[in-house]
Amino acid sequence: MKRLFLVIVLAILTMAAIAQEPYKAYCEIVGTGNITGTKVKIEVDFGQKAKWATPNARFLVDENGEKMNFNSMIDAVNYLAKLGWELILAYPVTPTQGMSKDPVYHYILCKKVTSDEQIKEGINLKDK
């Protein structure tokens, strides 16, 4: 009986040691509007490795591979909140050069995960 109890306790301790502690993963979403100002395109940066031709340019796409347009940045945040992301910080950056003086919105989000595979769960990305 003592041996069985010892085996069970060791099995439980082993499983507890294997279980990973959740950690926070972060991403940045950058929103840019179109000419009509009616929709926002969202670029996502998970800190992924940059590609030579399109460094860190990743847009949210639907199941058909089409770029997703959102009504506003909050619409995009709500979409990501359904996937477990939480808004941490938001700030605008206004261009100082060029024709457009419209601000580009940057939002920082975080999500608790236990593996890197969970970071992009439910999110489809496509280069520009």
Language-model segments: residues:
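Terminus-proximal functional modules
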Residues: F5-L6, I18-K128
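Hydrophobic h-region of N-terminal signal peptides that target proteins for export
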Residues: L10-I18
